[in-house]
Design a protein with these regions (language model features):
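Active-site loop/oxyanion-hole signature of alpha/beta-hydrolase fold enzymes
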Residues: 82-123
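Conserved HGGG/HGGXW glycine-rich cap/lid loop of the alpha/beta-hydrolase fold
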Residues: 40-90
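Catalytic histidine-centered segment of alpha/beta-hydrolase-like enzymes
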Residues: 262-271
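Short beta-strand/loop motif that positions the catalytic acidic residue
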Residues: 223, 229-231
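Acidic catalytic loop of the alpha/beta-hydrolase fold
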Residues: 234-238, 264-265
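Alpha/beta-hydrolase fold catalytic core
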Residues: 1-52, 77-78, 118, 278-279
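Hydrophobic, aromatic-rich cap/lid helix
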Residues: 190-218
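Flexible "cap/lid" loop of the alpha/beta hydrolase fold
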Residues: 130-138, 143-172
Length: 279
């Protein structure tokens, strides 16, 4: 039995849905399997091969389909590598390197080496934001710019890891779709497909449940490359005001944006991130 999936049938259902979503990838793409010490890592590469590289890291309980709405714009000016995080419901190995240790950075070292990258800009969401920030702290010479969407590790975490409490306990009838709407802040009508996908995933997938390590002020102060932090004011996972304050106070070249009326799921930031990456 898999450690991250509840059943083989569930694994197959998630994989089938992922393949369906990947068929919507709007630009030319190379599907790569990069060997790492944690097992093979699945990477989607789009954009001109000689363009500046950008690495995308999605959140927990997700995969690189996260970036379907962004990739066409970003891949015009950049060589974009959408990396499926190991231990998450995508195409990468099921290993889960221990957070707060060198293990995650060593995995990313292998990914970058396999892609023949000495450095790149990073865009990370939630757990992917934590991962990108951890890499910037540990490998500052390998991160040229850092865009973080609802990142973990800066502001206080309100709940155990993603969706755990709400999905397990909030509703006696275990209405995963409605619970996902509350956690993400997405509307049941306007974002029905996204919430259906979240419900499918958490029906069959066991997420990380531990709290994310929080970076110290001293660690954040070493992140001297340009940083863009975007958070939702109504995030129920992390204290967004705390995230914005600490990022502004501790990181020398950070720009922070707090989006009113937005929860943990931050959509529609294609243009601001592209502008940041182009500077």
């Amino acid at each position: 039995m898999s450690a991250i999936y509840k059943s083989e049938a569930g694994r197959a259902a998630i994989a089938a849905r992922y393949q369906e979503l990947l068929r919507r990838w709007p630009v030319a793409v190379e599907q790569l399997h990069v060997p790492t010490r944690e097992g093979d890592t699945f990477v989607l590469a789009s954009g001109p091969k000689d363009a500046p590289p950008v690495v995308l890291l999605h959140g927990s309980g997700s995969n690189s389909s996260t970036w379907l709405g962004d990739i066409a714009s970003w891949a015009t000016d950049f060589r974009v590598y959408a990396v499926d995080m190991v231990g998450e419901p995508g195409g990468s190995a099921e290993a889960r390197p221990e957070l707060g240790t060198e293990a995650v950075a060593l995995w990313l070292d292998d990914v970058l080496a396999g892609l023949d990258l000495s450095a790149a800009s990073f865009v990370g969401m939630s757990l992917g934001g934590w991962t990108a920030l951890d890499y910037a702290v540990r490998r500052p010479d390998k991160v040229t710019k850092l865009a973080l969407l609802c990142p973990g590790g800066i502001g206080k975490q309100k709940f155990g890891w993603i969706f755990k409490n709400l999905l397990d306990h909030l509703f006696s009838n275990h209405d995963l779709r409605r619970s996902a709407a509350i956690v993400t802040g997405l509307n049941l009508t306007d974002h029905a497909e996204i919430l259906d996908d979240v419900a499918l995933t958490f029906t069959h997938f066991n997420p990380r449940t531990g709290k994310l390590p929080v970076f110290t002020d001293a660690q954040l102060s070493t992140v001297t490359m340009p940083v863009l932090v975007i958070v939702g004011a109504d995030d129920v996972m992390f204290k967004s005001a705390d995230t914005a304050r600490r990022a502004s106070d501790s990181m020398p070249d950070a720009t922070t944006r707090v989006l009113p009326g937005v929860g943990h799921a931050i959509l529609g930031q294609t243009a601001p991130i592209l502008e940041f990456l182009r500077k």
